[in-house]
Swiss-Prot record:
Organism: Pectobacterium atrosepticum (strain SCRI 1043 / ATCC BAA-672) (Erwinia carotovora subsp. atroseptica)
Disulfide bonds: none
This protein's record includes keyword Nucleotide-binding: yes
Catalytic activity, EC: 2.4.2.52
BP GO annotations: prosthetic group biosynthetic process
GO MF annotations, alphabetized: ATP binding; triphosphoribosyl-dephospho-CoA synthase activity
Top enzyme category: transferase
Keyword Nucleotide-binding: yes
Protein name: 2-(5''-triphosphoribosyl)-3'-dephosphocoenzyme-A synthase
Amino acid sequence: MPTLRLPDGVLSAAVSRSVVSEYRERYSLLDIDQRVAHALTMEVMLTPKPGLVDRANNGSHRDMDVALFQTSIQAISPWFRHFTDAGYQHASVPLAQLLSQVRPIGIACEQAMLSATKGVNTHKGGIFAFGLLCTAAGWLTARGERVTQRSLCDSVAAMCHDLVRNELETCSGAATAGEHLYLRHGLTGARGEAASGFNTVCQHALPALQQAIAAGMDDETALLQTLLVLMAHNPDTNVVSRGGMDGLAFVQDYAQRLLAGPLDRQALIKMDEALIARNLSPGGSADLLALTWLLYHYPTE
């Protein structure tokens, strides 16, 4: 049974499945903004993370550190309540039409981030993914449907069904980094992951996290293991934008090698050094790790 981490970050004592279920159902909306903030904080504080900002170093980044991430999280966290409220208020709108209703909230949330960080993009991917999940949670709750891992991810998939076609397949030029990578490599990035209902998370990361914790790993070790699983399977456009497809192959192969044995923190530190030397940052996998941690605390079905 997953242990339950309360919004204030204090790990509760073991409780029965029925109590966990009641907690999750009762507070699925009331504290979702706190849950998102906790997941984002967990991700940045987790150490060591190859190529990423953590408590040991700034990874392959020269313009951000843990303190800046914390400032960013504080700035964007209140906006996730607005996503949830929008989903709740538009419960009569089909999911396929819901994305346009929350785009202005996403833009405002990004502006809050950029204002707080003085122009540094710390959480654009997180805003996109968590904004969609919060919107879905509000929509499901207003319709009297259960908020579960499956219902959240299925709802996001329905919301983003046409996203790749509308924003990538029809683009005439590479106006954004995502469009450039799609035109050059066929990578759909965060849009494709959302349109798939976060398939990489559901098929790889969540099972890995659940198995690791069931095997007795502490949260930090289980999350580091899960991060490696994500790095091994995620076609991370953050990596490709810095190192091309060769860079992606390097990260994926390295992660697969480490997964072949028990988790070794010294090996993670060496991987960190290797990614920094190549200026590679698996930021997409970091976003998906935070997403995995949030989803883990909801019932599966």
